Regions:
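Membrane-interface alpha helices of multi-pass inner-membrane proteins
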Residues: 117, 138-143, 151-178, 199-205, ...
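Loop-to-helix entry region of an early transmembrane alpha helix in multi-pass inner-membrane enzymes
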Residues: 56, 60, 64, 72-93, ...
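Transmembrane-helix motifs of polytopic, lipid-linked glycan transferases
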Residues: 68, 82-103, 267-268
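Signature aromatic-anchored transmembrane alpha helix within multi-pass, membrane-resident enzymes
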Residues: 198-201, 320-349
Length: 349
């Protein structure tokens, strides 16, 4: 509903010529399939071969699922949006199951799910993006690893690795949880633990192997990802942060706005390490590190949402009562604002 309100507001602004960016006309017209959603929809409909090579950086799981849903009569483009929305509901449900399993109070669980669903970048969960699918898989991996159900982790890890370029990061909590019992485990369980830790890499490798066979360069998805006009090359976080701040004085205010969020997220990662099992903090830290070591910080907030333990940490920090209600209300307002800016082509989701 909030995303629909944002889209309607953006459409009104466009129709009344309050916005002069020509890109706004396209993003409003494409709606939930704007920005990267257009790539996922095009891949689902026409395949990688019909797109420029830059399309290879979008891993295949979401387009494949969208195409499968499209066979039900809605078409692959609508199928991609349906997949994202269903996955968002699955992710929220699994988060409830996971946090209850961790023994958190019911009020904290409820607060965490609301903050997760209404986080400022959470509007992308209903876009035709891979975020919702990956988050559902990542939370499922955590649930499987924390309960030592390695067969489940293997299956979900394979899919997570095929869902996005950094999907293999879900191996981090798997390794940490496996090490807790590895020495005492029987040989068969050790083999399952090793397979579970390797599964996200195998999922990614299967796609890369296909790319190598089809296009002659298995690493092409990562090579195009590091182009200067996309994520850019790897750099140290201090340099990327300094460049973002410097951009504020050259008219790139949107880039500088990532910096306050970076500070908040780092603080919440500290909370993760202090108040949650080690696997949560490690996963969040490595996910954020991969985001801030890119020369281009665009979409930082979206990548931060993938580090879902930071949302759990926020739910632990915010107290019940007026603090909780205020945090949820402010988050919902921020999400609506960011979604509006994305539809107006003023913010890169």
């Amino acid at each position: 509903m909030l995303v629909a309100i944002a889209w309607f507001g953006a459409r009104v602004a466009r129709d009344h010529h309050w916005v002069h960016d020509p890109g706004a006309r396209a993003t409003v017209r494409h709606g939930l399939l704007s920005w990267d959603g257009a790539f996922y929809a095009d891949i689902a409909q026409r395949g990688y071969g019909a797109l420029p090579r830059v399309g290879l950086r979008f891993f295949p799981l979401t387009p494949l699922l969208g195409r499968a849903v499209g066979w039900l009569g809605v078409g692959p483009r609508t199928g991609v949006v349906i997949v994202a929305n269903v996955a968002a509901l699955v992710a929220a449900t699994l988060l409830v199951v996971l946090l209850r399993r961790e023994g958190l109070p019911a009020a904290t669980v409820t607060r965490a799910v609301w903050l997760f669903s209404l986080a400022p970048p959470a509007f992308v969960l209903v876009f035709g993006y891979a975020e919702a699918t990956f988050l559902a898989l990542a939370i499922g991996v955590f649930l499987g690893a924390r309960t030592q159900r390695w067969g489940l982790v293997i299956a979900l890890g394979l899919l997570a690795g095929a869902s996005r370029p950094s999907g293999f990061i879900v191996a981090v909590p798997v390794v940490i949880e496996a090490l807790r019992t590895f020495r005492a485990a029987p040989h068969r369980e050790r083999a399952a633990q090793l397979a579970a830790a390797a599964s996200p890499f195998v999922g990614a490798a299967l796609y890369l192997a296909w790319v190598g066979h089809r296009f002659g360069d298995a690493l092409l998805p990562y090579r195009v990802q590091t182009r200067a006009n996309l994520k850019g090359s790897f750099t140290d976080p201090i340099t990327s942060t300094t460049d973002a701040l410097r951009g504020m004085f050259h008219g790139h205010i949107g880039t500088a706005l990532h910096v306050p969020w970076m500070i908040v997220v780092v603080a919440l990662i500290v909370v993760c390490f202090r108040r949650l099992p080690a696997s949560y903090g490690a996963y969040a830290a490595i996910t954020i590190a991969s985001a801030v070591t890119s020369a281009n910080l665009d979409s930082f907030e979206r990548y931060a949402l993938s580090a879902f333990p930071v949302v759990i940490a926020l739910a632990l920090v915010v107290r019940a009562g007026w603090q909780s209600r205020a945090a949820i209300a402010l988050s919902a307002a921020a999400m609506t604002g960011y979604a509006t800016l994305a539809f107006l082509h003023a913010y890169v989701p």
